[in-house]
Amino acid sequence: MNLSNLQPAEGSTHNQNKRLGRGEGSGKGGTSARGHKGAKSRSGYSKKIGFEGGQMPLQRRVPKFGFTNINRIEYQGVNLDNLQLLVDNGIVTDTVDMAVFITSRLATKTEVVKILGRGELKAKLKVSAHKFTATAKAAIEAAGGEAIEL
């Protein structure tokens, strides 16, 4: 290495953008590349989101549709592999009910629980929940357990 091939470290330097409004001699003084007059030249200007220059904007051209069903029930899903994990960790042995879901943080007190069929269940369990999928119910009964709907 010698003085003819010195270079700054990688990433230590970057090109600075030309500063605006710092005198005519800078090439970007005066109007600061904003042109003359008008709303766009003023400070604080920002184009409104969705504004299309006075044309009817897309969100008003497209019709509304659908509604929110106030009677919809939001289920908290718990899979079979979660139940098997509770058995493997020694948290449950024979019955799984809402108290177990709450203590193991799989659901809260106010949530409605639905047992889903992902994974496999090897243990014989008596499971109490609000709803079961067909595959989950079949898997619980195939393992010798019982599926009780609350």
Curated annotation (Swiss-Prot):
Residues 1-52 are annotated as: Disordered. Disulfide bonds: none annotated. InterPro entries: Ribosomal_uL15, Ribosomal_uL15/eL18, Ribosomal_uL15/eL18_sf, Ribosomal_uL15_bac-type, Ribosomal_uL15_CS. Residues 23-32 have a biased composition (Gly residues). It comes from the Bacteria. One of its GO terms (biological process) is translation. Gene3D superfamilies: 3.100.10.10. PANTHER family: 50S RIBOSOMAL PROTEIN L15, LARGE RIBOSOMAL SUBUNIT PROTEIN UL15M. Binds to the 23S rRNA. This is Large ribosomal subunit protein uL15.
